[in-house]
């Protein structure tokens, strides 16, 4: 009897934990928040900074936002382009432009100080050059492009 009670309690705890976890992806309609006017997709992912010796630090939660072009915005302007915005747990953020091919498949735009390399283990390494010559290097397990495409 005691083992059955313990099993039920463990099963209940697992069900409650699964019910409380956030979904990986959340869709938000235009005007659904007070800080972003257009529609967007948010991913709950993991990021880790990379030390100068190339070794990654500990994982920390990060938020990945897909920001689609604003309707009627010219494509040559920032508002007319696709972006991914990454917010780190320490409140830093970076934006990476996306490009769409003829089949409307999105990919990270590289060049102009942006280098992106899949690590082969579910993580992707991002190296972004700042305007002041500094570099931001981090890994993320983001799946946002797979989800969008």
Where are these predicted regions, by residue range?
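N-terminal secretory signal peptides that target proteins for export/translocation
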Residues: 1-5
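Cysteine-centric segments in proteins
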Residues: 24-149
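Sec-dependent signal peptide recognition
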Residues: 6-13
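C-terminal motif of bacterial Sec signal peptides marking the signal peptidase cleavage site
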Residues: 18-19
